[in-house]
Amino acid sequence: MIQTETRLKVADNSGAREILTIKVLGGSGRKFANIGDVIVASVKQATPGGAVKKGDVVKAVIVRTKSGARRADGSYIKFDENAAVIIREDKTPRGTRIFGPVARELREGGFMKIVSLAPEVL
């Protein structure tokens, strides 16, 4: 469960290393985001020469959470870290590579480009 002020690792090569959640999108007064949800975030750490700079306000999709997600078959999936991928308005990633595994829930959210770039889908 990701909420406002949560810091997330960035799992792509867009140039950002860490982002801070500003707002969870999807409804008035929504408090938490899970895997596959879109957030508005600020870049807190960035690599030199990257496409995004420190202080940029970006949209990102959650790809891994420590709290995990419950699936329809009753199983749960949890990860070691909270991570997100920075996206454009059309749900495509800003970077060209995805690092680490991503959850299968992204497929239902329409993030097929992220699923196809990921090295592993769990």
UniProtKB/Swiss-Prot annotation:
Keyword S-adenosyl-L-methionine tagged: no
GO biological process, one term: translation
Keyword terms: Ribonucleoprotein, Ribosomal protein, RNA-binding, rRNA-binding
Protein name as annotated: Large ribosomal subunit protein uL14
Family: Belongs to the universal ribosomal protein uL14 family.
Coiled coil residues, start to end: none
Function of the protein: Binds to 23S rRNA. Forms part of two intersubunit bridges in the 70S ribosome.
Signal peptide: none
Organism: Streptococcus pneumoniae serotype 4 (strain ATCC BAA-334 / TIGR4)
Gene3D superfamilies: Ribosomal protein L14 (2.40.150.20)
Gene of this entry: rplN
GO molecular function: large ribosomal subunit rRNA binding; structural constituent of ribosome
Complexes and interactors: Part of the 50S ribosomal subunit. Forms a cluster with proteins L3 and L19. In the 70S ribosome, L14 and L19 interact and together make contacts with the 16S rRNA in bridges B5 and B8. Can interact with ribosomal silencing factor RsfS, which may inhibit ribosomal subunit association.
One annotated Gene Ontology cellular component of this protein: cytosolic large ribosomal subunit
